[in-house]
Design a protein with these regions (language model features):
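Solvent-exposed, extracytoplasmic
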Residues: 126-140, 213-267, 304-330, 437-450, ...
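Extracellular/periplasmic juxtamembrane segments that couple receptor/chemosensory ectodomains to their
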Residues: 2-74, 260-395, 575-644
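Conserved secondary-structure micro-motifs at functional edges
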Residues: 645-776, 781-782
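Extracytoplasmic/periplasmic ligand-binding sensor regions of membrane-associated signaling proteins
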Residues: 127-226, 267-281, 432, 447-455, ...
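Short hydrophobic alpha-helical segments used for membrane anchoring or interfacial signaling
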Residues: 110, 146-153, 237-244, 272, ...
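Extracytoplasmic/periplasmic sensory segments of membrane signal-transduction proteins
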Residues: 26, 31-179, 350, 354-492
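Short hydrophobic beta-strand segments that form the core of ligand-binding sensory/regulatory domains
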Residues: 199, 211-217, 295-301, 514, ...
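Flexible loop/coil segments at beta-strand boundaries within sensory signal-transduction domains
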Residues: 205-209, 288-292, 506, 520-524, ...
Length: 787
């Protein structure tokens, strides 16, 4: 623990507290009020005021520390979670992308043109093969180079001009020695230059013998830039680091250059970088479909001066109970603050009651000042408590929005690969022959590497299925879908056709996407390749990866017409127009209420990936939605009595609230106000149904009377009891809140007949300016019929 400006913070929070301006603002306001309380306590003691302020002052002091520490911890948690979301999304998106690369290298290494070229070892063949590599790279734009080498390391051909000698890089030997598997390295190689490159290699075989090594060089810098630009919203620094903490690539080479070792200590929350303190977090990549990734992590940093800035979403009204998302500690803080304020209200109220029979102007003024200071203290605590809850709510909103963004980004990236796959496989010479047996073997090999497909089909120029990778029962079937005709009309090898998301007979009647590309021979379509996406498990996996930890959360993909493509559970809310009208790349987050329950909702409309859905003519908008349940919808408004001006020569009236109804009794009829927490509740019917229990007072069992039903406020909170006397019987009147004790002008009660049971309890009306208050009769309250 460490102390900062008189407040003791946990060690991991204390160094950062000075940068949390709202914490400092609340601390200064409460410190100023603390000095005022000290002065008022001294004056109360010197004036023999019957108001012991010590307990209330001590409680305020204790809660001040707890409130500020809690606020600081939650602000740090929010900032850390925001950075954590950015870091986790970055590394997980990269891992999913690289998973596709492991499939690419495995399939391309079996490409007939590549295998035949390696076996021929003919420069003329290699020159022609280079054009095929360019066609591949035009579809799979994630690669910056493709290199084909002989078993002895000689570069046979490559996508871009560069090293053309004999490679001695270890990756060649590793690929040759790893039969049937890929080699993944991030290191400098002689065929890629002095800088490290993320490279995937696979041995090229013919008849079981190695005839070459194929290497795909991933364009990591461009991919990282796209990921970081999408995630960094302010001045965050994002970097991928290797297992030793060395920077691989970052979005700010000046602050985190490649090769720089980020020295993170376990549990460290901050890091000095370039003379500036940064909040820092690190997240490691999670395996995807068995692929562990390259073993990297994302480090995310934000200057502390910006990390704790006001978030626009922090202004959301917390009108939900939050028992499943707020800790009990958070829920207790505003409750304790209100309880302390009520004890202060009782103290001041009782002080005014005790002064009613006296003419001590100083004591009355002192009590009024104590009450005013209490109200100012209450305002500060309410603002701080509200900020505490909205800070946590902002974290939920940010989490929902981030995860919705992740889900739809992963979807677009995944389907980008599907558009690439169909276009590339349509260039296969084997499939162009329309030989069913040869095609079936090729399609089965493809589907074994690319497991995201339920089936891969070859169809002819009439739309008849020639071969299938898995479900061969569709062979010979005539396909009449619109996407088939669209595909066969295409004459550009870079174009493709796609179905809308709809039920398909090729997918057991369930909804899915089908991507298709034409097989062109001499400029004419002789058929096409169709990929039936295995949407049910694939979409579910994407959504579950974006599912918050909060129990009952739901993630979904929707269309703009509200139709649900996939979901992890029933959507508990109706999506509003603000969600369904989102345009590409737009996000929304907010709180929705349905059926008396509240939900934090985040949504993002997909914006495509690279050329997919951005410049390739494909338009299929999808919105990612994440819903987090937040408990019952509640109204946090607490009714308070208005300020009442004293009327010269008036009668002192003690006012109070039952529910939201402002009522009063003559101050002279009130002995005092007491707590009712320890009351014994009983129920009686008939005439005595107002008599609801007892509370111990002055060593006696004080009957309690409840008139809430009489004022149409049944069920209102009952936090105080006014000790009154009816004849010779003491009793306690249950009330919700205390109002002012003020001098008011009394008038006779008139014209109130027929307005409910409350009229039977009213003796007079009290007036101050435009405020009229019914003044109740103690005798009628205790002994009158209940209706």
């Amino acid at each position: 623990m460490a102390t900062y400006k008189g407040i003791t913070f946990p060690d991991h929070v204390a160094p950062l507290a000075r940068h949390m301006h709202s914490v400092d603002d609340h601390r200064e306001a409460l410190a100023s009020l603390s000095g005022t309380w000290d002065t008022l306590a001294l004056l109360a003691h010197l004036s023999n005021l019957k108001a012991d302020m010590s307990e209330v002052r001590a409680s305020f002091g204790q809660l001040t520390g707890e409130l500020l520490v809690c606020l600081a911890e939650e602000m740090l948690k929010l900032a850390d979670e925001t950075l954590g979301h950015q870091a986790q999304i970055a590394v997980d998106v990269l891992t999913r992308n690289l998973f596709e690369r492991t499939a690419d290298i495995g399939f391309l290494a079996t490409d007939a043109a590549i295998v035949d070229a390696c076996a021929a070892d003919d420069p003329a063949v290699f020159a022609a093969l280079r054009e095929r590599l360019r066609a591949y790279a035009a579809r799979y734009t994630v690669y910056r180079d493709i290199v084909l080498m002989a078993p002895d390391g000689r570069v046979l051909t490559r996508l871009v001009d560069g090293f053309a000698g004999r490679s001695s890089s270890p990756i060649v030997g590793r690929a040759l020695g790893d039969q049937g598997g890929y080699v993944e390295t991030y290191e400098a190689t002689d065929f890629c230059g002095a800088e490290p490159a993320l490279t995937y290699a696979w041995r090229v075989e013919q008849n079981g013998h190695a005839v070459g090594v194929l290497a795909l060089v991933f364009d990591l810098e461009r991919e990282a830039r796209m990921i970081f630009e999408r995630l960094a919203t302010h001045d965050e620094v994002l970097a991928f680091v290797d297992g030793q903490g060395r920077v691989v690539v970052s979005n700010d080479a000046a602050r985190l250059p490649p090769g720089h070792r980020v020295g993170l200590r376990d549990g460290a929350a901050s890091l000095r970088l370039g003379g500036v303190t940064h909040l820092v977090t690190q997240r490691r990549g999670q395996p995807y479909q068995g692929y562990p990734g390259p073993g990297w992590a994302t480090v995310a940093l934000a200057p502390v001066e910006l990390a704790f800035g006001a978030d626009a979403e922090g202004s959301v009204a917390v009108e939900f109970s939050g028992e499943n998302v707020f800790s009990q500690r958070l829920l207790d803080v505003p409750v304790r603050a209100r309880e302390i304020q009520r004890r202060l209200d009782r103290m001041v109220w009782n002080g005014r009651i005790h002064q009613a029979a006296e003419s001590n102007a100083f004591s009355r003024s002192l009590l009024e000042e104590i009450a005013a200071t209490g109200r100012r203290t209450k305002d500060v605590f309410e603002r701080a408590s509200s900020e505490l809850l909205t800070t946590v709510a902002a974290g939920l909103l940010g989490e929902a929005r981030f995860l919705a963004d992740l889900s739809v980004d992963v979807l677009d990236r995944n389907l980008y690969e599907r558009a690439n796959d169909c276009r590339w496989w349509a260039t296969s010479p084997v499939l162009a022959t329309m030989d069913a047996n040869a095609a079936r073997k090729t399609l089965a090999h493809i589907n074994g590497l690319y497991t995201v497909y339920a089936n891969v089909l070859l169809f002819d120029a009439q739309g008849v299925v020639v071969a299938a990778s898995r479900d061969t029962s569709v062979e010979g079937r005539q396909l009449t879908n619109a996407w088939v005709a669209d595909c066969l009309k295409l004459r550009d090898p870079m174009r493709y056709a796609a179905s809308p998301f709809e039920p398909s007979e090729l997918y057991r009647g369930a909804g899915t996407y089908v991507y298709a590309a034409p097989i062109l021979v001499d400029g004419s379509a002789v058929g096409g390749v169709a990929l039936v996406f295995d949407s049910t498990p694939q979409f579910e996996a994407m959504l579950r990866a974006a599912l918050p930890e909060t129990a009952g959360s739901v993630a979904a993909f929707c269309r703009r017409d509200g139709a649900v493509i996939s979901r992890t559970g029933e959507l508990p809310v109706t999506l509003p127009a603000s969600v369904l009208s989102l345009t590409a790349g737009q996000s929304w987050s907010g709180v929705l209420t349905e059926g008396g329950l509240s939900f934090v909702v985040g949504a993002t409309a997909g914006s495509g990936y690279r050329e997919f859905k951005t410049s390739d003519g494909y338009d299929e908008p999808v919105i990612g939605v994440v819903v987090i349940p937040c408990g019952q919808a509640v109204d946090r408004h607490v009714a308070t009595a208005p300020q009442i001006a004293n009327v010269p020569g008036g009668t002192e009236i003690a006012t109070f609230l039952i529910g939201e109804h402002l009522l009063g009794v003559p101050a002279g009829d009130v002995i005092e106000c007491i707590e009712v927490q320890a009351a014994v509740r009983v129920w009686r019917g008939g005439f005595a149904q107002r008599h609801v229990g007892f509370v111990t007072w002055n060593d006696m069992a004080l009957p309690l009377v409840d008139i809430a039903a009489d004022v149409n406020a049944a069920g209102a909170a009952q936090r105080h009891a006014l000790v009154l006397k009816a004849g010779t019987q003491w009793f306690g009147l249950l009330v919700s809140e205390l109002g002012p004790v003020a001098d008011m002008k009394l008038t006779e009660e008139r014209g109130l007949t027929g307005k409910g049971d409350i009229t039977k309890l009213i003796a007079q009306l009290a007036r101050s300016g435009s405020v009229f208050i019914p003044v109740l009769s103690a005798d009628a309250i205790f002994g009158g019929p209940a209706g």
